[in-house]
């Protein structure tokens, strides 16, 4: 810009006292039309002309005069002291007031579909409307929070199962030339919305969303909408808009920080967030921002002391996408100002400070886990017993960590990556030398697909489509190549795991990687013995694991009965009652240290690939949900209710 403009320093807050001296009591607060902060902004905004002619200069001056007037109106002296010293508008203004914690507020019941997560009999109109009122979830007891956490998990499981199902169908139709691939993440969300399966969709939640915990990870923005965590698919600021607010004021409730604005500054607990607007399709600032829509909503939230939820988008390479979204908790907006950004245009900035007393930020945990994977001894100088418990028998090393005591018990066992089947255990005809005759990869009508009921068990990313009694994979006598999508569990461990010592569970297992829902983790390995052999060995004190006692959590994965009322769980191929055991007294693997839980994040799926004997399937473990780095793995061993959270190496 070639000329100096006659307006104040934009880095300074306008003087509210002087700016309001000439106003009258009848003046109204100026609010503009809602404009959301897109990431990136969808609509092209023409950059200002670089010429220095008089008309262009006059227009620019007029624009900043308009912004200054907007500032003045935003700080009009129409405030009175409210409860706890909070400044609010006059009683006749109709403004939304932040209610103190001890005061009565609207206590909402869970919306339809939240209590028992069943399909509503009334299909929601595709013309979906955002909520028209703010609400804060009532403070609940431990059991209520625990129950609603499970409801949230089931909803996420339904979303993931539906998304994977739709993606597989879309890929299949695309290969057959029956249509182009569609966004399965969006399609799954819209289907669930039309079935009334979105949570909190009838209220605009302020503060924490019940069931969502700090550190929860999401792969898609649409999932945030399904849970009511952030209601915008592209916009960075989610707020109750002025058009929908009874008071005509927007109130911001959550933001997504994904690095789309060059003026953002993020140090974790303190965040300087750039307002919306003024960007082109290359994410470059090309125009000045205005105090409207989400920007005004952020200012109003600061004014009323309303906290906002912060979700961070983090680059993380995985089989689904190159970015994940992490819920990092609640922040308070403590300051805002208008400044000239790096590109030379005026932008609004908001300083947010994280509220104390919350768990560690999920984004910080992910960064710590990344450093731990690459330089473990630098992050933890002491405590490591072994950097590879498997002695290179797994595809990736298995760490052994103990900073509690001097116990090194896991090193005393022979590590095996796969279960050992003693010779002759199958009897005559147990080993089948037949397989499919596909080339490179299997087709839908191959022998192995027919064994699975006419469909493949996995999608192209190796995720389990739906749980079954047993899954048949391509085996040694199949002619398809190693890249066949029907070869998943036989490839072994892919995620880095750590066996760690715990005061609560004895030994436990946590992941150093982000494990996606439906992904294969590892095999549960031991020496397979018959029932008679197990009885004899047990009398000698050998430790036994009984695969037939694991709960059938696989029934929940891929269960779309909430979405499609006529959905029927697959009953073919079937599996007879299992009557074998695994002796883990001398030979075992990392899975044997996974703790027991009635609310597991890992499920058992029986698989056959190197033989066809239904009485002796392999015990494979899959993720029931997205498992964050450093989260502990847990299984439901089928133990009594009073046994929970303790080392359950014998069931």
Swiss-Prot record:
List of residues binding Zn(2+) 2: 436, 448, 474, 478
Binding locations of Zn(2+) 3: 442, 474, 480, 484
InterPro entries per the UniProt record, alphabetical: H3-K9-MeTrfase_plant, H3K9_HMTase_SUVAR3-9, Pre-SET_dom, PUA-like_sf, SET_dom, SET_dom_sf, SRA-YDG_sf, SRA_YDG
Domain of life: Eukaryota
Tissue: Expressed at low levels in leaves stems and flowers.
Database matches in PROSITE patterns: PRE_SET (PS50867), SAM_MT43_SUVAR39_2 (PS51575), SET (PS50280), YDG (PS51015)
Amino-acid positions noted as binding Zn(2+) 1 in the UniProt annotation, renumbered to this chain: 436, 438, 442, 446
Cell compartments where the protein resides: Nucleus; Chromosome, Centromere
Ranges for region Disordered: 1-28
Any one GO cellular component localisation term in the record: heterochromatin
Gene3D superfamilies documented for this protein: SET domain, SRA-YDG
SMART domains linked: PreSET, SET, SRA
Comment block on domains: Although both SET and pre-SET domains are present, the absence of the post-SET domain may explain the lack of methyltransferase activity. Besides, the Cys residues in the SET domain that normally bind a zinc ion are not conserved. In the pre-SET domain, Cys residues bind 3 zinc ions that are arranged in a triangular cluster; some of these Cys residues contribute to the binding of two zinc ions within the cluster.
Protein's recorded name: Histone-lysine N-methyltransferase family member SUVH2
